[in-house]
Amino acid sequence: MSTLRLLISDSYDPWFNLAVEESIFRQMPATQRVLFLWRNADTVVIGRAQNPWKECNTRRMEKDNVRLARRSSGGGAVFHDLGNTCFTFMAGKPEYDKTISTNIVLAALNSLGVMADASGRNDLVVKTAEGDRKVSGSAYRETKDRGFHHGTLLLNADLSRLANYLNPDKKKLAAKGITSVRSRVANLTELLPGLSHEQVCQAVAEAFFAHYGERVEAEVISPDKTPDLPNFAETFALQSSWEWNFGQAPAFSHLLDERFTWGGVELHFDVEKGYITRTQVFTDSLNPAPQEALAERLQGCQYRAEILQQACDALRVDFPEQEKELQELSAWIAGAVR
């Protein structure tokens, strides 16, 4: 019986793909070597220890229907579209070795006619007339008895959109967490016009088989056809949840300030696990009672635009004469935290 396993995802859902990765990683025999090939539709994928409000333009992502997905490995934020080919290599220890998986990807690129080199800890680069360009980035995760190496190959990604979603708004966030490093990148189709996702997957799979000296049939998976993965429904529910993707962010503070016709307002939030743990308000409004009540009401709320907007709107019952002010506050706060 082969110790290799090759899975290819037919789904573009990042939460599905990351849940499959997590489930297989947890339940695979320690003697198995797995290659999982996949790609995501428009998604920003952040590292396990990152703050999405700090790393991403969350407002633009919401407007453009770009998903956020937190992965279980470390590293920085990346934008995925269907021009990215994603790979995951998994193995038990002591077999797990990210040098082996890196060399498999390099061999795959070489077989396609692309000469690439490993650079630094995580990147694969190609030499161009303009200097080195990154075509692949990776991240890693290890437990006591197994490890995985996953990464992306920039095939034909819309590089103009990288800056749209990975340059965060200039929000006043005093945030902890790992900050992403931006690199100069290139698409493989600039070197090999017409190169397809299927060709890249085939090349990586062949290099995988060649390294281990055996072959297996690919298992094609999708939400309609998943392998037998224990607790997959629970893993998918977590991976797709706001609590994991946003709420898992390191603690941070957010300062909002705005001047309205009726006065200036400063709101200070401390946020932990996606919930507001402390709120302070400062205002020169002639009637500060609504703002003070709002600060009290927002404490304990989820740091989500719609939740904070509901809290603001609920105060209009208590302060009917300040309804217009509260409407303006509600719209401002909701816009600021998106």
From Swiss-Prot:
<comment type="function">
    <text>Catalyzes both the ATP-dependent activation of exogenously supplied lipoate to lipoyl-AMP and the transfer of the activated lipoyl onto the lipoyl domains of lipoate-dependent enzymes.</text>
</comment>
<comment type="pathway">
    <text>Protein modification; protein lipoylation via exogenous pathway; protein N(6)-(lipoyl)lysine from lipoate: step 2/2.</text>
</comment>
<keyword id="KW-0963">Cytoplasm</keyword>
<dbReference type="InterPro" id="IPR004143">
    <property type="entry name" value="BPL_LPL_catalytic"/>
</dbReference>
<dbReference type="GO" id="GO:0005829">
    <property type="term" value="C:cytosol"/>
</dbReference>
<feature type="binding site">
    <location>
        <position position="134"/>
    </location>
    <ligand>
        <name>ATP</name>
    </ligand>
</feature>
<dbReference type="GO" id="GO:0016979">
    <property type="term" value="F:lipoate-protein ligase activity"/>
</dbReference>
<protein>
    <recommendedName>
        <fullName>Lipoate-protein ligase A</fullName>
        <ecNumber>6.3.1.20</ecNumber>
    </recommendedName>
</protein>
<keyword id="KW-0436">Ligase</keyword>
<keyword id="KW-0067">ATP-binding</keyword>
<dbReference type="InterPro" id="IPR023741">
    <property type="entry name" value="Lipoate_ligase_A"/>
</dbReference>
<dbReference type="InterPro" id="IPR004562">
    <property type="entry name" value="LipoylTrfase_LipoateP_Ligase"/>
</dbReference>
<dbReference type="GO" id="GO:0017118">
    <property type="term" value="F:lipoyltransferase activity"/>
</dbReference>
<feature type="domain" description="BPL/LPL catalytic">
    <location>
        <begin position="29"/>
        <end position="216"/>
    </location>
</feature>
<feature type="binding site">
    <location>
        <position position="134"/>
    </location>
    <ligand>
        <name>(R)-lipoate</name>
    </ligand>
</feature>
<feature type="binding site">
    <location>
        <begin position="76"/>
        <end position="79"/>
    </location>
    <ligand>
        <name>ATP</name>
    </ligand>
</feature>
<keyword id="KW-0547">Nucleotide-binding</keyword>
<comment type="pathway">
    <text>Protein modification; protein lipoylation via exogenous pathway; protein N(6)-(lipoyl)lysine from lipoate: step 1/2.</text>
</comment>
<dbReference type="GO" id="GO:0005524">
    <property type="term" value="F:ATP binding"/>
</dbReference>
<comment type="subunit">
    <text>Monomer.</text>
</comment>
<dbReference type="Pfam" id="PF10437">
    <property type="entry name" value="Lip_prot_lig_C"/>
</dbReference>
<feature type="binding site">
    <location>
        <position position="71"/>
    </location>
    <ligand>
        <name>ATP</name>
    </ligand>
</feature>
<comment type="similarity">
    <text>Belongs to the LplA family.</text>
</comment>
<dbReference type="GO" id="GO:0036211">
    <property type="term" value="P:protein modification process"/>
</dbReference>
<dbReference type="Pfam" id="PF21948">
    <property type="entry name" value="LplA-B_cat"/>
</dbReference>
<dbReference type="InterPro" id="IPR019491">
    <property type="entry name" value="Lipoate_protein_ligase_C"/>
</dbReference>
<dbReference type="InterPro" id="IPR045864">
    <property type="entry name" value="aa-tRNA-synth_II/BPL/LPL"/>
</dbReference>
